[in-house]
């Protein structure tokens, strides 16, 4: 035991405790973003919610994912582009044929015959389209895609689109008469123009969509703006009662 200090002697002051470091709070987790853009969710796109029963669905202001199906010469790319350009809300248009032709060297042209290479490049293009669509939708931008989807060919079927975009994708078939697609095909140039026999064969296979339950628009006698307005009507019904596919 240390000796007591003599009378009148004050003990030395106790030094103050060293300051404690400020508590470090972890920064809030950044959203899944690239710059200020939201990346698509890991899951597929869900079906758009129908508005209350008392109000009619308005496809012109709803964020949608649409797949416009049709044979060569059906006008699906022209209609999809017009529809996207004239909506009052942000809307993107993605044509699978355009994406497939991003491959410059080594492009597997389906006109040269359907083989493993053309199938692989088709699958890749479809997957790329699906990711792009989900990316647009994640940022509040609707998307319309167009592709010649065959009802009798699993690899070129709706299943792949459903996997890559999601069950919220709304498919619509554009199917004018054979004489119309032959006439439109004759106006094409480059590798987008097909032989008449091939156009007729594709058109015949597309007839398999009848009875599928998907909405079908016969635009044989319709111009592009009228077809786009009819597409809005079809989509309004699809939002209210989504087709089973």
What is each PLM-predicted segment?
Residues 165-209:
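A glycine- and Lys/Arg-enriched "phosphate-lid" helix/loop adjacent to the NTP-binding pocket
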Residues 68:
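Hydrophobic anchor at the beta1->P-loop junction of P-loop NTPases
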Residues 73:
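Walker A (P-loop) phosphate-binding loop of P-loop NTPases
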Residues 76:
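Conserved lysine of the Walker
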Residues 120-165:
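Glycine-rich phosphate-binding loop used to anchor ATP phosphates in small-molecule kinases
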Residues 1-57, 240:
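Long, basic/Gly/Ser/Thr-rich N-terminal segments
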Residues 81-124:
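Conserved substrate/cofactor phosphate-moiety recognition/catalytic segment
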Residues 190-230, 242-245:
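Small-molecule kinase domains that catalyze NTP-dependent phosphoryl transfer to phosphate-bearing small molecules
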